[in-house]
Structure formats: C-alpha cells, structure tokens
Amino acid sequence: MDAAVIRQALEEKYLAPTRKERPLYSGIEVEMPILNLKKEAVDFDLVHRTAERFMDICGFVPETRDDEGQVILAADPVTGDSLSFDCSYNNIELSLGKAQDLQLAKIRFFHYYDVLQELFSAHDYTLTGMGVNPYRIYNHNVPIPNGRYRMLFHHLHSYPRYRSLTMYFHHHPAFGTFSSASQVQLDVMDTDLITIFRAFSRLEPVKALLFSNSVLLGENNGMICVRDMFWENSTHGINPHNVGMYECDFYSEEELLDYISSTSLYCVERDGKYLNFAPTPLLAYMELPEIEGEYYDPESGGFETYTFKPELADLQYLRTFKYEDLTYRGTVEFRSCCTQPIRDTFCVAAFHLGLLEKLHELDELLENEHVLYHQGYTASELRHLFVRRQYPPYISKDGLNRLVGEILDLARDGLAARGMEEESFLDPLYDRWHRKSNPAMDMLRMLEEGKSIEDVILLYR
C-alpha cells in the first residue's frame, strides 16, 4: 500500500480533528473494582442485576450487550454519561459525557456512585478507589464473554509465544480484570499539540509521586504503581511505542505522525469476528499480502485460525496505551493515573485541566528546572524509579518538594483563570505534597501500623 495514502489517512484520523475550533471540554472515566466483602468471588449474576436496577433508577439505556445478553455498556441519552464494564465483570466504569464545569460533573458522578453503592451494599459488596483489586485472589478473573474481550484476554495470555524476545513478561496476563485507572480526555488544538506532548511527558515522574495507588499486595510491595509494569511488560509492550512514555521529544506534527506510524496493530475485525495476531508495526502490516489471525469460536469453545488481507480501514483498530494518547476525537487522553480514593476522584481531571490552561508556563518550568532534568536521566527512567520509591542520588528531596509545589500552584492558577471555583479539587494533592505521600504509600503505612486491608478499602471508598 502506498505510504503516502497511509500518511494521509493518519493525518485525517489524528490531526484533522484538532484543527476544528471548539470549546474546551473534558471527558472523565473512572474505573473501580467491585469487592465482595465476604472474601468470596464476585457473583456476576448479582452484578448484572445491579446494572439493570441502576439503569432503571438513573434512566440509562443499554447500548452494548455481551454474547449472553448481559449489559456491557449503558448510557444516558441526554448527557452521554455511561456505565460500563471493563475487561471483566469484576470492574465497573463510570464515564461522564462532555463537561465544561467540573463542579457539575462531580454532582452527576457522585449521584451514580451513591446509587451503585446502595445497591451493592445490600449484598455486602462495595466499590472502592484502588488501582489494584485487593481481593483479586478470590475472584474469577475471566473476560467478559464477547469477541473483543475474549480476543484481548487471548492476546495477553499469548506471551509464552514470545519468549525468544529480549523482554521480560510478568505473569499476570489477566491484569485487565483487576486493575483500575482514572483517565481524562481534554480537547486540544493543533497549535498546542507538540507542547502538550513535551510538557506532559516530562510531568510523568511528578504524577507518579502524587497519584500512585496500585500496590500488588503480596508481590512487588515496593512498587506503588504496578499498573506501569502490567502494561509495559505484557504483550501490549512487545512494541514499546504502543505503551508507556515517549522516549523522544516531538518538534513538529510530522514527527508525531512518524511516531504513530511506528506503533503496532494486534487485532482487527472481519465478518463479525475479532481477530488477534502478532503485534505488527503499521507500515509493515500494510505491506503484507495476508495475515493469519485467530478468533474465538463459540461452538468449539476455542480459538480458530482465519486468514485475511490488510485494509486501510484497519486504522480504526490502531490503538495504543501511551500515558498521553492522541485520539480520533481531537482530544489527548491522559492515562497514567491510578483510580484514586473515591472522595479524591476529581483531583485527576482538575490537575490536568488546570495545567492545560497554563501549558506554556508548565513547558517553560520543566524545560528550565534542574531538579529532575539535565542530569542524565530521561522522564521515563525517572518515572520507573519513582514508582519503585527510588531516587537518583543527584535529586534533592527539598528541591523536588519545591518543584511539586510550583506545579500544583500552576494547576491552581489555571483553574482559577477558568473562574468556575474548581481549585478545591486540588486540595487532596496539596495534602499529599505536604505529607510527601500518595494513596499507595498511605495504604502501605496503614498496613505496617497493623491496620487491615478492609480498613483501607472502607477508607478509600
């Protein structure tokens, strides 16, 4: 396939939407683990009944069902808010439609959350704000029974096929069934794109300090955001350009498109079947005459082979898991934050929204500071260290603390400039800054002091 044709299609998908004048909206997605407080496996039938009851109460309409007729996605036809299940029925997600005012978004979110909690609590269940399900060992960590999630589960479990690669694979391929994130999408303009990727990529080590909340109890207890490892050391990370951070700065839209061109596809859909195949870089994929993939066959209960030809339309399946992801909607999705304690949910969106308002000041600050950078370490290396509570010897703890405070002040000033009284959403982050802590470190400290994991679950819900 002509490379120029592919390039034009990428530009239309990713860049064209950013050139349209529009208001600044935010889209907020919060994943949460469902916990059975009896320390037994989550009863999926109970989850299905709860979802149906939630729809009745909140006026949501079913949009997607699994192969057994159960609701995967339901939405409010007016606001665009949605309830969904991510990867498995052990995880629930509340997503808010386009919002300009975080205060109004908060009201809607907590209404939905309170309804769910009341329904679940009647059966000794609860939701909580943790990035790794602390009761994962009790659950049936199986995928939602539909083509997409069975394909994804199969893809992640195929890592033994790639043992010849010089990369480490962790042994938790079902991580999507017990890990949760708090994500925000913000509308962006093409004139700001390169600055956004540069500044927010450099910000990632600081975000690790403020937002880490994913401890894999019993393993890797020194790691406060194990979600990074889940993605990077899985089959998603076979092509490192598909996950994590950017190891380079972009100076033009052309360089950004070059990077997107280097990412890999690992699935497409044909004849209603989701096909999985070895991750293949986009340009190489388009040059192949045909590819052999695998799909789940409900009749056999296993995976069968299916040979297909690449098509330009397959660009719709090009999906990466970068910490800053440019989407086809003209938004940048910020993906690196763990689910937060529920009371602090909106600190994630507020932090990113405030800093986007002060984008150029943030870029200048991170370009010229010498606490983190200009000392031989990249942003990616620093984040990898920080999520392990390790610090290069050159870093001054006092200097780092001052830098984090300056960044929080920038976010606060950005929110103040919006004039919507959203600054209070940053209060949890200022508290963490003053205490030099984050939810993961707070949890580990509580456990060291003799508190139970149930104490943490109830505190974070």
What does each of the following model-derived ranges do?
Residues 108-113:
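Well-ordered, non-membrane alpha-helical segments in soluble/globular domains
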